[in-house]
From Swiss-Prot:
Its EC number is 3.4.25.2. GO terms for molecular function: metal ion binding; threonine-type endopeptidase activity. It comes from Listeria innocua serovar 6a (strain ATCC BAA-680 / CLIP 11262). The gene is hslV. This is ATP-dependent protease subunit HslV. Belongs to the peptidase T1B family. HslV subfamily. Na(+) binds at residues 164, 167, 170. The lineage of its organism: Bacteria, Bacillati, Bacillota, Bacilli, Bacillales.
Length: 179
């Protein structure tokens, strides 16, 4: 059985960038193993935030590989993401990893997947994981209708809170990082 399930949400808003993730780790489809996992982390001298959804062991492998790429390309987020995606897609061992990453710095927000995709959203919002669609919808509504009164970190936190009320694989122990 694998450990997985989570929700990660990221937003760029009013010159700031924030990412939030819940703390639930689920064994299979029915057992919560941990409530306080930290799936959002700062990398590269605290200039980059990365969050993962999927298999925990696979995600840690990808974090290490991504951080190595960031160091290799001196913090160039886009180049590091593209290089990781290429390696992930072409390496027979990495190709079996079951996880997705959202990575961001102050200027750029990207989704990185094992199929070789590196996607930058049109609206500055991304969400992945079991509650990703709920968080995405909530985040878009918050940004669109309350954006003038909320900071990026507040949009991220509230989007995750709403997702946790709907998705059984997402809890309300939320970690938020902001740039």
């Amino acid at each position: 059985m694998e450990l997985h399930a989570t929700t990660i949400f990221a937003v760029q808003h009013d010159g700031k960038a924030a990412m939030a993730g819940d703390g639930q780790v689920t064994l299979g489809e029915s057992v919560v193993m941990k409530h306080t996992a930290k799936k959002v982390r700062r990398l590269f001298h605290d200039k980059v935030i990365a969050g993962f959804a999927g298999s925990v062991a696979d995600a840690f492998t990808l974090f290490e590989k991504f951080e190595a790429k960031l160091n290799e390309y001196n913090g160039n987020l886009e180049r590091a993401a593209v290089e990781l995606a290429q390696q992930w897609r072409s390496d027979s061992v990495l190709r079996k990893l079951e996880a997705m990453l959202i990575v961001m710095d102050k200027d750029t927000l990207l989704l990185v997947s094992g199929t070789g995709e590196v996607i930058e959203p049109d609206d500055g919002i991304l969400a992945i994981g079991s509650g990703g669609n709920y968080a995405l919808a909530a985040g878009r509504a918050l940004k669109r209708h309350n954006g003038g009164q909320m900071e990026a970190k507040d949009i991220a936190r509230h989007a995750l809170e709403i997702a946790s009320e709907i998705c059984v694989f997402t809890n309300d122990h939320i970690t938020v990082e902001e740039l």
